[in-house]
Swiss-Prot record:
InterPro entries per record: Diketo_gul_Rdtase, Mal/L-sulf/L-lact_DH-like_ah, Mal/L-sulf/L-lact_DH-like_NADP, Mal/L-sulfo/L-lacto_DH-like_sf, Malate/L-lactate_DH-like
Catalytic activity: 3-dehydro-L-gulonate + NAD(+) = 2,3-dioxo-L-gulonate + NADH + H(+); 3-dehydro-L-gulonate + NADP(+) = 2,3-dioxo-L-gulonate + NADPH + H(+)
Record has Oxidoreductase as a keyword: yes
Source organism of this protein record: Escherichia coli (strain SMS-3-5 / SECEC)
Name of protein: 2,3-diketo-L-gulonate reductase
Keyword field: Cytoplasm, NAD, Oxidoreductase
Top-level taxonomy: Bacteria, Pseudomonadati, Pseudomonadota, Gammaproteobacteria, Enterobacterales
Molecular function as annotated in GO: 3-dehydro-L-gulonate 2-dehydrogenase activity; NAD+ binding
Entry's EC annotation: 1.1.1.130
Main location: cytoplasm
Pfam name, any one: Ldh_2
Positions bound to NAD(+): 168-174, 224-225, 304-306
Taxonomic superkingdom: Bacteria
Functional note: Catalyzes the reduction of 2,3-diketo-L-gulonate in the presence of NADH, to form 3-keto-L-gulonate.
GO CC terms of this entry: cytoplasm
Amino acid sequence: MKVTFEQLKAAFNRVLISRGVDSETADACAEMFARTTESGVYSHGVNRFPRFIQQLENGDIIPDAQPKRITSLGAIEQWDAQRSIGNLTAKKMMDRAIELAADHGIGLVALRNANHWMRGGSYGWQAAEKGYIGICWTNSIAVMPPWGAKECRIGTNPLIVAIPSTPITMVDMSMSMFSYGMLEVNRLAGRQLPVDGGFDDEGNLTKEPGVIEKNRRILPMGYWKGSGMSIVLDMIATLLSDGASVAEVTQDNSDEYGVSQIFIAIEVDKLIDGPTRDAKLQRIMDYVTTAERADENQAIRLPGHEFTTLLAENRRNGITVDDSVWAKIQAL
């Protein structure tokens, strides 16, 4: 089905206010959920909202909490999210990293005791729109087996890198072949995954999203490489924030909350002039996209460039929402 941005935001806002969230906070949170969905990231927008409300009702998320600065070391700061609303706090933390970068050339904010930030790409994009390189990542509850194991002991720990090119170039990727959100999107659409995304119950690689959702044997991105990246990203976020690791979040908490996150902004213009920056970026993009195609009907893609098209289509034609997901939200 199709809904407008206004309908989507109003639905989110209604549910948030009915759960006791104050009107200003509810409006800002609903806006971010709606913007994420409008951008085409359904898995971490509308599809994720019922799960967000469940955690709000369970007390994992404290809606009136505010992040608190703990330590300041010039370009590096350490903050405690105090289990505040994840997407609103993440936006504030990237804004703070940008402020630090404006003074120092680079800014790094390490955040502990945080909640799920929903679409991580929003915060990299936020920096790139202002002319900064944006880098951020988060750890999570253990939802992926390390390479060679059957039992979940590492997080998908998504990493975002956004570049202020025209259009913005951005990688937003979990350390698994697919996020659990994308498994859900494909299952709801009745589609197999385009490539193997995990193992079935017999240990064979599979493209069936429902099987992987159930047995949790999701495949690390690049096999052992994604497994290794997940571990070191967790270590860095834990040390810099003095926060909880994947092991602590999984073993000590009743659900996925109290995670650790990193936000980095780099002011490119302190290192290179604008025309030179633009020319270098354009040469990179042209060199990549003019490669001989494996399939003449399939253009070479640059990461993140599709979001401009998806956003325009959703604004023109309405936002696609799965019927069953919309019914869940209406029933909240």
